[in-house]
Design a protein with these regions (language model features):
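Conserved nucleotide- and phosphate/pyrophosphate-binding catalytic cores
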Residues: 204-405
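NTP-dependent nucleotidyl-transfer catalytic core
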Residues: 1-193, 201, 208-213, 226, ...
Length: 405
């Protein structure tokens, strides 16, 4: 089975410009490809997983990844898939985030012996002459055509700034620049980037008379059509300081029954034949084993074998005894926040990140989905005495430790 065939079999491919040429290049290790990452936070998150795994797969097949950090475009803001204008960032914040990204990516990508490179488009975009851009690049783009793309149509009613309107031109110029300087002949990205990617291939064709290719990756959506990688606390980060290895493991251990096989195919390096065999007989205990395999595989990939072993052992200990709290996610509550040594259950649930609002916490309590120190809490007005270590159980699988500082 070729690399390209496996990508299709796993369901990784959404759209592409030329299937035969793309397959030929990546199957023979002749693709120098790039994927862009927006440095809008100081850590990668689950939303980046698809791109990271694709880069790793293609590099293992002899292809060369270029990681493009959008230090320049982050100062504009990408309207693709957005309904509001994004806050612009300072150069200092962007550089800090770039440094954090490089460190995390090294777990996925081999940067030795020039096997992969990291570039920042701020290095060329911030030095461009405006008149030159208008003459050399702007002349290659049709405003009429740009306005037909969904990313702009969605924003027209609420207001699209000229600043954001330039994003497609800047991203297209990135591809053109990488093609010239590094022989980059292919771009990969999320399906919401399709219009921007086509702009790059067209610019290369018009300016250089050469062919370049684009392929979009399937978006990581759950069975309800919502993007995966969110919890009550927010994003699921790849930084252990933001999302602990145990929390990361638990996120994947608790995916819905309908999503586990899809996640194994899209995100792990478990052989596709093994996954397909599991899919044919997936029920009962085998379903739990599939979820454990998913959680362990991804935790090992992101945090290493030792952290994955610890997370798995902690999860099993908690589920079997309900008492092992050593590796539980923990929230420290300042003593000053307590009244007579206690706190209302609804406030406590929100502060611990177990619920997004008091209303959600109230419904959960009323439905019998909350226990504190092995005692079910059914009164939304209950005051919980916090003394030493307090263990909250949400539903059947989520455990959380609260300590007072």
């Amino acid at each position: 089975m070729t690399v390209f065939e496996e990508l299709k079999r796993r369901g990784l491919i959404a759209q592409m410009t030329d299937e035969a040429e793309i397959a030929e290049l990546i199957n023979n290790g002749k693709a120098t490809f790039y994927i862009g990452f927006d440095p809008t936070a100081d850590s990668l998150h689950v939303g980046h997983f698809m791109a990271l795994c694709l880069m790793k797969r293609l590099q293992m097949a002899g292809n060369k990844p270029i990681i493009l950090i959008g230090g320049g475009t982050a100062m504009i803001g990408d309207p693709s898939g957005k309904t509001d204008m994004r806050k612009m960032m300072t150069k200092e914040t962007i550089q800090h985030n770039v440094d954090c990204f490089k460190k995390q990516m090294s777990r996925f990508i081999d940067f030795s012996e020039d096997k992969a490179i990291v570039v920042n488009n701020g290095d060329w975009l911030l030095n461009l002459n405006y008149i030159d851009v208008l003459r050399e690049v702007g002349a290659c783009f049709s405003v009429n055509r740009m306005l037909t793309h969904e990313c702009y149509k969605q924003r027209m009613e609420r207001g699209l700034t000229f600043l954001e309107f330039n994003y497609m031109i800047m991203q297209s110029y990135d591809f053109y620049k990488l093609f010239q300087d590094y022989g980059c002949n292919m771009q990969f990205g999320g399906d919401d980037q399709w219009a921007n990617m086509l702009g790059g291939t067209e610019l290369i064709r018009l300016k250089l008379g050469k062919d370049a290719y684009a392929m979009t990756i399937t978006l990581l959506l759950n069975s309800e059509g919502k993007k995966m990688g969110k919890t009550e606390k927010g994003a699921v980060w790849l930084d252990a300081e933001k999302t602990t290895p145990y929390e990361f493991y638990q996120y994947w251990r608790n995916v819905s029954d309908q999503d586990v096989i899809k996640c194994l195919k899209l995100l792990t390096f478990v052989p596709i034949e093994q996954i397909e065999e599991m899919e044919r007989t997936l029920e009962g205990q085998q379903l739990n084993q599939a979820k454990e395999l998913l959680a362990y595989s991804l935790t090992e990939l992101v945090h290493g074998k030792e952290a994955a072993d610890q997370a798995q052992d902690a999860a099993k200990a908690i589920f079997t005894s309900g008492s092992s709290s050593e590796n539980m996610p923990t929230t420290a509550i300042p003593a000053a926040d307590l009244q007579d040594g206690g706190m209302g259950i609804l406030t406590l649930m929100v502060k611990a990140g177990l619920c997004a609002s008091n209303g959600e916490a109230r419904r959960l309590v009323q439905q019998g989905g909350v226990s504190v120190n092995n005692e079910k809490v059914t009164d939304p007005k209950a005051i919980i005495t916090l003394d030493g270590e307090t263990i909250i159980k949400k539903g059947k699988k989520v455990f959380h430790k609260v300590v007072v500082e």
